[in-house]
Amino acid sequence: MKIIILRPIKVTSKVEHDFLFPIFRCKNYLTDLGYTIKLKNKLDNSLLNCDILCVLSTCIRHHGKDKVYMDELRKFSELAKLTYFLDISDSGGVFYERGFEIGAVYYKKQIYHDRSYYTNTNTCEPRMHFDYVIKNNFIKKDSHNIPDNYSHISKNIIDDIRISWNVGLGDYRTFSFPSKTLLRGVIRMQTKICRKPMIFPMFQNRYDFNEYSDRNVDLLSCFGSYDLTSKPISFHRKASADMAASLNGDYKVASGFFPVDEYYTLLRKAKMALSPFGWGEMTWKDFEVFINGIALLKPNMSHLETWPDYYIENETYLPYEWDASDISDLIERVVSKDGFLEQIARNGQERFKSFNIHNDPSPFIQRFETVFA
C-alpha cells in the first residue's frame, strides 16, 4: 500500500514533528509489511500516485487563507483514490470544518467521550476546559480568541470521527543540552534527515527512576507561561501555580522558570509534578514527567478518548479538579500513604514506556495497520 502524507509548504511545527515521529522511526518495519510512505509538501499530480492521500491539518492551518492553494487541495483530494484528513490540533474540542470536505475519513488525535458536547448549542467554547472556565465566571468570554461551536454540524459527521494516535509517541528526551530550543532542533534534524534516532548513548531515551526517598523536591510546578493571548489558559494555569505556591513551607516546591540544565536536574529530583492544560489537554510536560518517573498530578482527564491512553485515574496519574481547588487536599492525602506516590510514579513510567517506540514499536505498528486497514 502506498501512502502519501501532505504537509504544509516550508513549515514544520513541533506538534507535526511529534505526530510523524513514530512513522519516521518505524519506517523499516512498515516497509517490511508492504507500506510505502512518502512525505510531500507540494500540490502536484504526484499526489495521485498513491492508495491513500493523507492531508495534515497543518496544511489548512498555514494555507487556509490562500484560495488558490485550497482550491487545488480540494481538487487533488477529490481525484485521489481515498483521502484521509489527519487533524493534529492540540485539543479534543477543535475541528477543521474544511477537513470534513477534504477527507473521506476524518482522523483526530483525541476526542471527547461525550460526542453530544460538540453539537450542544449552549457551549461557549469548543474546548471543554475553556468552556468550563467561562461558564463558571472565572473570566469573561473573549470572542476574539474563541471560535464558534459546532452545533451547525450534523451529529452523524461528529460520530464518524476516528482516532489516530497522539503526540505521546513523539520524542521527549530530557538529557542536558545548552538550550531546549537547540535540543528540539537537533531531534527534528536527525528524524528529518536520518529518519531514525541516533544510536549514541546520549541520544537515547532515558527512563530514569532515581531512589524515591532520596529526592528532595516534593512538588515541581514549572510549566509554560500563563499565555496572555488566551485568558482561559492564563486563568487555568495560574490557578494551579497559585495552589502550588501556597504549599511552599509545608512542602519543598520548585516553581517558575529555570535554565534547561537546571530544569532537567529538578526532573530527576522531584517526587510529584503538576501539568495543567494548555491549548490542548495533553502537554509535553506529561511525557517529561513520565519518562523521569515522577508522580503526575493533572486536571481530570476522564472526559478524553485517545490512543495511547496514558491516563488511568489513581494508577498512572493523580487527577485534580479543573479549578485546582483540591490540590492541597490531594497532596496531603497521597503523601500520607506509604509508598503510594512512588507506585503511581512507577506505573506512569511503565505505561508510557510500554507504548514508546524506542522500547517497543509493535503497539504503534498495530495501531498504524488499524488506521490504514
PLM regions: where:
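Catalytic binding pocket for nucleotide-activated donors in carbohydrate/polymer assembly enzymes
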Residues: 264-373
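Nucleotide-sugar donor-binding catalytic core of glycosyltransferases
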Residues: 2-42, 47-50, 55-282, 299-304, ...
